[in-house]
């Protein structure tokens, strides 16, 4: 089979020169293929050679590729090519068929001639080629005359697709003041046309808008800066339009464009600047340290960390600028001027300082642009306030002898009004600091004097608060703390440290140490204590004992002879005179008690006659703690036992069944109904009945104990006659005394008195009043049936009153 190349020109007569040229290319290929023997590799389908005649020579397809132009817009099917078998003699006995991609739909074949036509518009960008198979069969027997051959129909590309930017939107950035040629970003477009055929997919990039500031590489699409002076403060964002054109930019090529957003990033190329060169503030002189005077902010055209700045204060000579300091607000980048020393309007009324602002981060590349700092003058005016008087000094120490007379001068405090008016000052002592009013102060001069006698041994120091206030405005008040030390004078005699008692054996030897004596003195002389010991002048030569002054503020008592006889004298009292060093010299006499005791051979005391001798001993802290712990344990045990007993009693009482007995109360006066029972503890009253039963008596009026009988017998012993003008109170006294004695002897009476006073007729009781004065007079008001609704306890009462009512109404009926 061989093609008919001349058929390829059938549909091209009316084509444009370009399309005609494209169609001629495959025709030239057809001519070349027709003159060249077909290789065996172009004849797939040799597996069907067994269908051919055994003596037939194998033939091969001489054409296996066709071309068809895409985007054909004609009304007639587009001729693709012709397949032809060498065995075709033109008599119509051979039938040509095709199969494969698009066979029968896109591509149709004439069974007689083998002409192939494309019936649909093809798009190479969707599918570039179609693979089909051709068969030549005997029309009568449908037998393959030649092996099936595979061929390809390629869609011939035309420039019908414009370039597209597929990765937009494009956003790039570049630092301001970047040098010319600085790379910003790269953009790339794609073309769906065949890059291997012609120039349909060869793209060229160009800048349509923004060429004054940026350029683009025609081949790579890299965007670069075109100028070195991009300034973010002037323009922060640029919209650059980039165009991609195919056909290598030649005339007739298709193009596509995209917009690239280029953001100019900030660099620190602008120093801080104060909007004005002088700032003025005012503040009261009483403002405490740390008070903010005001805020000042230097402006910076940069953004981000490039605007971070610090502030410094520089004092002008003699302006007192050290009274303020400056801090930086990290959020607002404002300078906060703060008071750091106490201000004084009278000393200085205006403070002038230089405020300097500078960037934290300075880029050395832009150092040639100038210094990145600025200065402004800040003036702070101090306003006057009415200040309280000031003590000079604000605190102090005074001293006074403890034997100073009342009214003696202790010291003088001074305060003055710091204001320019210099108003007079009055003084006083805060009595909360001197509750006993030991000191007084002169209101005009501030002289402090003693108001009472002093005693260093009672209070060696006094802390008082002195008040100073303006004479015409007591609200302006200040305070000063004074410490007054009471100086000691020798006004307390020395005394023996303890009431000394010593014991000596009957067989004591001469010179034996009995007791070492020490002394205490409440005074505290500046040179220290020095005490002297000696026996009293009345007994300077004691035959039994001697006293030795050791000269270290102690003395030793020794025996004078051998042995003592406790039958003759078992106790000796040794008076000792103790003298201090003054001045003035004071003395006192103490007594050492010496007991004569019987001792064993080792000198251990056995007995001291019938007089108990207590050895002087001191308990250690551990022994004291142990003793206290024992006492606490005993107290806790006692409380625990008491609590258990009470709990046991309450438990027993709770187990007793509730007393369901009714209470019948007899009234001889116009009482208050059920409210009379509210003041009684019914369980206590009923205990009388229980106690009487236990004793075998009859609380209801039977035999009773003698105290109860006496009480009952005297129940009506009060005289009932008219009272005399001058009553005999002894009768009442005797009566009450007997009642008290009976109550004390009777164990069954309640442990408290019950005294009732009735000032109403019981209207508040749920049962209303039982008094005849408050009873109803109508028949409806005498209906007692409602008592049955009160429960079983009141049913007998309801029946009783119901029967009484029937008796009263019978005669009437």
From Swiss-Prot:
Molecular function as annotated in GO: calcium ion binding
InterPro entries reported for this sequence: Cadherin, Cadherin-like_dom, Cadherin-like_sf, Cadherin_CS, Cadherin_Y-type_LIR, Catenin-bd_sf
Cytoplasmic side: 643-813
Keyword Glycoprotein: yes
The keyword Signal belongs to this UniProt entry's keyword annotation: yes
Expression (tissue specificity): Predominantly expressed in brain. Abundant in olfactory bulb, cerebrum, and cerebellum, less in pons, medulla, and spinal cord. Low expression in heart. No expression in lung, liver, spleen, kidney, testis, stomach, intestine, colon, and placenta.
Gene Ontology BP terms: calcium-dependent cell-cell adhesion via plasma membrane cell adhesion molecules; homophilic cell adhesion via plasma membrane adhesion molecules
GO CC field: plasma membrane
Compartment(s): Cell membrane
Region named Disordered: 696-726
Main location: membrane
One Pfam family hit: CADH_Y-type_LIR
Extracellular side: 34-621
Induction remark: Down-regulated by thyroid hormone.
Stretches that traverse the bilayer: 622-642
Membrane topology reported for the UniProt record: Single-pass type I membrane protein
Keywords: Calcium, Cell adhesion, Cell membrane, Glycoprotein, Membrane, Metal-binding, Repeat, Signal, Transmembrane, Transmembrane helix
Highest taxon in the source lineage: Eukaryota
Glycosylation sites: 159, 463, 609
Domain comment quoted from the record: Three calcium ions are usually bound at the interface of each cadherin domain and rigidify the connections, imparting a strong curvature to the full-length ectodomain.
Descriptive protein name: Cadherin-22
Organism: Mus musculus (Mouse)
Upper classification of the organism: Eukaryota, Metazoa, Chordata, Craniata, Vertebrata
Gene behind the chain: Cdh22
